[in-house]
Swiss-Prot record:
UniProt KW GTP-binding keyword: no
Keywords assigned by UniProt, alphabetized: Chloroplast, Plastid, Ribonucleoprotein, Ribosomal protein, RNA-binding, rRNA-binding
Predominant cellular place of this UniProt entry's protein: plastid
Residue runs in coiled coils: none
Species per Swiss-Prot/TrEMBL record: Huperzia lucidula
Localization in the cell: Plastid, Chloroplast
PANTHER family the UniProt entry points to: RIBOSOMAL PROTEIN S19P FAMILY MEMBER (PTHR11880), SMALL RIBOSOMAL SUBUNIT PROTEIN US19M (PTHR11880:SF8)
Family from the record: Belongs to the universal ribosomal protein uS19 family.
Gene Ontology CC terms, in alphabetical order: chloroplast; mitochondrial small ribosomal subunit
InterPro entries attached to this UniProt entry: Ribosomal_uS19 (IPR002222), Ribosomal_uS19_bac-type (IPR005732), Ribosomal_uS19_CS (IPR020934), Ribosomal_uS19_SF (IPR023575)
Name of the molecule in the record: Small ribosomal subunit protein uS19c
Alphabetical GO biological process terms: ribosomal small subunit assembly; translation
GO molecular function, one term: structural constituent of ribosome
Amino acid sequence: MARSLEKGPFVAYHLLKKIENLNVEEEKKIIVTWSRASTIVPIMVGHTIAVHNGQEHLPIYVTDRMVGHKLGEFAPTRIFRGHAKNDKKSRR
């Protein structure tokens, strides 16, 4: 279900404040956040945001094609190690 257009996108206040401060100072620092639910807005483009995946913070460089997506979409939480190589032995 989509979010109402009246409400606007969700962006954590602390994250928005950090990005605005960096834009004013014209700095490019890595911003560490746990807010995977925050929507990527146009003022984030060009910044590197380290998003927590449950174990570590993964640095993500935000491009213009990412606008409208959530930060958590770019930091996978599960690692697929593949299926069993030889399944015939386990069946017998």
